[in-house]
């Protein structure tokens, strides 16, 4: 079936045969062609005076949408702080929950077979299964793989399928019960951005995708795959899942790299006021004024209480790369930048926040960490000053090493003590127990190393080293170097310990050879 034949039949299916001129205006097909199409379909008894006959509906059958997949596994880290408290798809925008609005729009279009692929805070979505009769697939690797994994997990249900993101907002219903061919939704922009720009041929088919651009049709919103496209893309998903070379990639990257091997996908351009994706709280505030004065966020409320400010004064949220145990973001207040540290799930099992707070206060007093402002010892959140133009030390730059060791030497020479200890061996055994409880197989390769460390622990017990206040987690990411300052941050594991812990943590992460280690220790002992 040709495109204009499909457009004619689908229009009549939805609206009836309500005048050739109106059909021509709505489908952008000339009046003469509409007349010819009507005569053609009447001749084969696909059309009568009322509209499509059963035979006409049968002609549309290959183009009927089978189902929809809504991707909702990721954390949406750019959407801090709200994404730290709930998945972005569950935000209420214009008084409707994003993913619920999308499910209802799919239902209105006659698409009832809907599957959600979940990961981050998945339990918060489970109510949708009963409320809207949706199906659920769990992506357990959402935090280490990108959405190629999500689609791989859903590979067996790829047919005539809508691929949607849970956090899109459509001001009008963009879904159809029947679709002619595969397409990627788009809006046309005339300014430079970091979006993905689709280059198309004279058939409106995507022939190339550029990351970044000055103007053009950008990838934005939902996607539709027909049976042919789904079959070929499923083969790619299976192949590259085995190779693992696209684990960190968006599915669009896999598409971009294989455009010439895949069935055609068109660009479907919408007006700029139809499709919205909110990449930050600031963008959402511009769309929904409710979030300006009353942002429903415990984190925002924490900041407001600390600084005695209103929510609309807090702006410019930017995520910082996730740490091993926590997630942090930058925010601006009164033209000054700060860092908010949000404790990771489960960290209460390995970190004593009361001890951490006392350590931070002591480190600030010693000017080892002058950035500290406040920490809530019950909930574990922390606010610090943001330091511009910082870098971490280069393990193989000895000038950096000397700066690090000067700070550690001075810290140890204070010979301070606190009322708790950090015991590396005992703490490691606690973490081992936690990991074993979750998945015993993760520790198999650790046992030979554990036996060696156990002997070392016994050997150093008789050293007679006087314990004192130490940081105990001195690897490079916990240092901030400026032209004039050497700052040691993140005191979660601090306490009374052998000062060798502070040297050993740095040496271990640097993976120094014996000669470099001896040089490092000699510099410390000067």
Residue ranges, per PLM feature:
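Conserved beta-loop-beta/alpha segment of the NTase-like Rossmann-fold superfamily
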Residues: 123-196
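Conserved NTP-binding catalytic cores of kinases and kinase-like/nucleotidyltransferase enzymes
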Residues: 264-371, 463, 483-486
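N-terminal nucleotide-binding beta1-loop-alpha1 segment
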Residues: 51-84
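Active-site activation/catalytic loop segments of kinase-like enzymes and analogous catalytic loops
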Residues: 500-526
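ATP-binding pocket architecture of kinase catalytic cores
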Residues: 318-423, 440-447
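An alpha-helical support segment within catalytic cores of ATP-dependent transferases
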Residues: 298-313, 416-472, 522
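Active-site acidic catalytic loop and adjacent metal/ATP-binding pocket
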Residues: 318-332, 339-340, 455-501, 515
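Conserved core of the sugar-phosphate nucleotidyltransferase
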Residues: 7, 171-246
């Amino acid at each position: 079936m040709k495109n204009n034949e499909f457009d004619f039949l689908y229009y009549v299916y939805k609206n009836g045969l309500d005048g050739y001129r109106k059909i021509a205006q709505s489908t952008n097909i000339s009046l003469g062609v509409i007349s010819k199409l009507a005569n053609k379909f009447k001749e084969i008894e696909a059309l009568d005076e009322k509209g499509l006959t059963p035979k006409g509906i049968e002609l549309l059958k290959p183009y009927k949408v089978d189902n929809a997949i809504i991707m909702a596994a990721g954390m949406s880290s750019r959407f801090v702080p709200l994404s730290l408290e709930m998945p972005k798809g569950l935000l209420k925008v214009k008084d409707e929950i994003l993913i619920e609005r999308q499910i209802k729009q799919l239902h209105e279009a006659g698409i009832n077979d809907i599957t959600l692929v979940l990961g981050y805070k998945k339990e918060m979505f489970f109510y949708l299964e009963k409320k809207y009769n949706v199906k659920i697939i769990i992506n357990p690797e959402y935090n280490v793989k990108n959405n190629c994994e999500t689609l791989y997990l859903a590979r067996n249900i790829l047919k005539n399928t809508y691929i949607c993101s849970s956090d899109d907002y459509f001001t009008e219903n963009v879904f159809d019960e029947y679709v002619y061919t595969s397409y990627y939704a788009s809006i046309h922009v005339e300014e430079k951005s970091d979006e993905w720009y689709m280059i198309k041929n004279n058939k409106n088919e995507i022939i190339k995708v550029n990351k970044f651009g000055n103007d053009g049709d950008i990838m934005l919103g939902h996607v539709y795959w027909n049976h042919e496209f789904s079959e070929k893309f499923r083969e790619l998903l299976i192949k590259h899942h085995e190779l693992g070379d696209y684990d960190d990639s968006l599915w669009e990257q896999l598409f971009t790299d294989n455009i010439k091997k895949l069935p055609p996908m068109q660009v479907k351009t919408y007006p700029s006021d139809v499709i919205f994706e909110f990449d930050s709280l600031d963008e959402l505030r511009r769309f929904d004024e409710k979030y300006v004065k009353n942002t429903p966020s415990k984190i925002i409320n924490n900041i407001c209480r600390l600084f005695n400010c209103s929510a609309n004064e807090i702006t410019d949220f930017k995520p910082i790369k996730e740490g091993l145990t926590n997630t942090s973001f930058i925010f601006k207040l009164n033209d000054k930048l700060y860092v908010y540290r949000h404790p990771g799930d489960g960290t209460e099992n390995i970190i004593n926040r009361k001890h951490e707070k006392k350590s931070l206060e002591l480190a600030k007093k010693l000017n080892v960490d002058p950035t500290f402002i406040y920490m809530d010892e019950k909930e574990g959140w922390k606010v610090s000053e943001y330091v511009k133009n910082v870098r971490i030390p280069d393990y193989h730059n000895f000038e950096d090493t000397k700066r690090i060791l000067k700070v550690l030497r001075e810290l140890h020479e204070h010979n301070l003590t606190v009322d708790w200890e950090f015991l590396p061996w005992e703490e490691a055994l606690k973490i081992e127990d936690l990991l074993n409880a979750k998945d015993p197989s993760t520790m198999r390769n650790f046992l030979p190393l554990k036996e060696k460390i156990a002997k070392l622990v016994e050997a150093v017990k008789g050293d007679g080293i006087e314990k004192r206040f130490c940081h105990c987690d001195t690897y490079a990411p916990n240092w901030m170097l400026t032209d004039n300052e050497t700052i040691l941050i993140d005191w979660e594991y601090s306490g009374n310990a052998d000062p060798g812990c502070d040297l050993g943590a740095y040496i271990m992460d640097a993976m120094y050879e014996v000669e470099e280690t001896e040089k490092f220790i000699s510099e410390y002992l000067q």
